[in-house]
Amino acid sequence: MSIKIGQASLGETGGHGQQPGNQTGRELNFSTWYPAVWLGVLRFKDPAKAELAAKACEDGVKNKNIGYDMDNRNTAYAAAKAVGWDLSKITKPVETDCSALMMLCAISAGVHKLEDLFRRQGNSCTTYCMRHDWPQTGEFELLTAAKYLKKDEYLLRGDVLVSSGHTVMVLEDGKHGEEEREVVEKSKIIVDGKEVSVERILKNGTNYVKVRDIAAALDLEVSNKGNIAVLTHKEK
C-alpha cells in the first residue's frame, strides 16, 4: 500500500478560468504515492518544520475554501498571509495550484525566506523555482537518488516530491523512514583553530559526533568501562 500524499490537482473543469474554492471536493485532495517522472525530493533539514508543513498541507486540503486555478493561484497566498499562514483559517473562496500550495505549506512551517522570494518574483514558485531556489534558503536538501524518486519506501512525512509539472507533499513515512531519520555524513570540527574531519550523525534534528572522533581531535586516548567512554591524556 502506497503512502499518503496531499496535493492540488485540477480545477472543476481544468486549469484556467475556474471558480474560487474547491468546487468538486477534489481540486485539493488526499491521494496515495504514485510512480511519475519525479526529478527531486525537497526534504526539510529541520524535522519539526517538516511536521508543520505536513500539518499545513492537511489543513489546506480539508479547507474547501481553497480551490485550484492557475490564473488566480496567488489569491490563497494573500488570504493565508492575512491569517498568519494558518490554512485552516481561510474563510473566503480563493485559489492556488500545486506549487503555490507547497509554498504556502513551507511558509506556514517557518521558511520565511520564501516570502522574500515571493516579493522579488511577485509570484508563487513554479516547480522549476522550487528545485532551484528552495535549497538556496538553507532549509532543504534536494534528494535525487533513485531510491527517493522511484519508490516511496524512503520518503518522510513533510517531504515534497517535484516533477517538471507537478508537486505533492508526503504525509506518511515510508516503511524505511526510520532509517532516513539518522543521517551520517562527513563533517569537521575546529579545535584551537585547526579543522579536524569527523563523522556527523543527524538524528531527529540533533547533531552527534562519535566519541572516538572527538578523542582523536583532542589527542586523547579512548577506552571504555562497560558502556562508559573513558578519555585520558596520551603519555608523552
Describe each model-derived feature in a short phrase.
Residues 160-162, 169:
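Hydrophobic beta-strand signal
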Residues 116-132, 225-232:
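Short linear loop/turn motifs
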Residues 134-149:
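Short, structured beta-strand/loop micro-motifs enriched in basic residues and often containing a Trp
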Residues 97, 126, 210-213:
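Helix N-cap / beta->alpha transition motif
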Residues 152-159:
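Loop/turn positions that initiate beta-strands
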Residues 42-46, 170-176, 231-236:
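Short beta-strand-to-coil "C-cap" segments at the C-terminal boundary of structured domains/repeats
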Residues 1-3, 179-236:
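Primary recognition of N-terminal secretory signal peptides and signal-anchoring hydrophobic helices
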Residues 1-119, 164-166, 177-178, 185-192:
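N-terminal capping segments
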